[in-house]
């Protein structure tokens, strides 16, 4: 995975910066997420009932599980800022769950840098248009605008331009 200098990041606005590795969402992962979030709706944890009573043909992943996987997708698919000391989630805008992710499906994330702004001497706020794609499906699982903070040592900060 290559690195990006913070002084170069503004020139990359509008460009795709990375695509993550594929992740298989199996029933065990869905069940663990259900346990962690106390969301045991049958469409997620009961494949037989979901096949019989839902329009999905079987169990599907929680939308929030798919959203939560963006962290690992970011680590596997995005270049790092060379001078960054840590990254922090700031939030999401326009999260949309487009298509269900069926048990056994593989997903990956695509990241397009949509904005970057120097906030303080050691803070760069970035925004990414993210898309989680489902293997062999035409429509994505979700789209969102992910806002993150890159913190770095003030002596290494990019010059405002």
From Swiss-Prot:
Pfam families: MaoC_dehydratas (PF01575). The keyword Cell wall biogenesis/degradation does not apply. Disulfide bonds: none annotated. Residues 10-130 form the MaoC-like domain. Keywords: Nodulation, Plasmid. The keyword Cytoplasm does not apply. Involved in the production of the root hair deformation (HAD) factor specifically on medicago. PANTHER family: MAOC-LIKE DEHYDRATASE DOMAIN-CONTAINING PROTEIN. To the R.leguminosarum biovar viciae counterpart. This is Nodulation protein N. It comes from Rhizobium meliloti (strain 1021) (Ensifer meliloti).
């Amino acid at each position: 995975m290559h690195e990006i200098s913070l002084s170069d990041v503004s020139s990359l606005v509008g460009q795709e910066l990375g695509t993550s590795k594929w992740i298989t969402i199996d029933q065990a992962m869905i069940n663990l997420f259900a346990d962690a979030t106390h969301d045991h709706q049958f469409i997620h944890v009961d494949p037989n009932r979901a096949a019989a009573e839902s329009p999905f043909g079987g169990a599907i992943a929680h939308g929030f599980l798919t959203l939560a996987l963006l962290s690992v997708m970011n680590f596997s698919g995005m270049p790092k800022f060379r001078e960054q000391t840590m990254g922090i989630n700031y939030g999401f805008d326009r999260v949309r769950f487009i298509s269900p992710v069926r048990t056994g499906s593989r997903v990956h994330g695509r990241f397009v840098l949509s904005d970057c702004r120097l906030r303080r001497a050691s803070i760069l706020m970035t925004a990414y248009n993210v898309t989680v794609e489902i293997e062999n499906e035409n429509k994505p699982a979700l789209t969102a605008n992910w806002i993150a903070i890159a913190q770095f040592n003030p002596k290494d900060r990019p010059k405002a331009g």
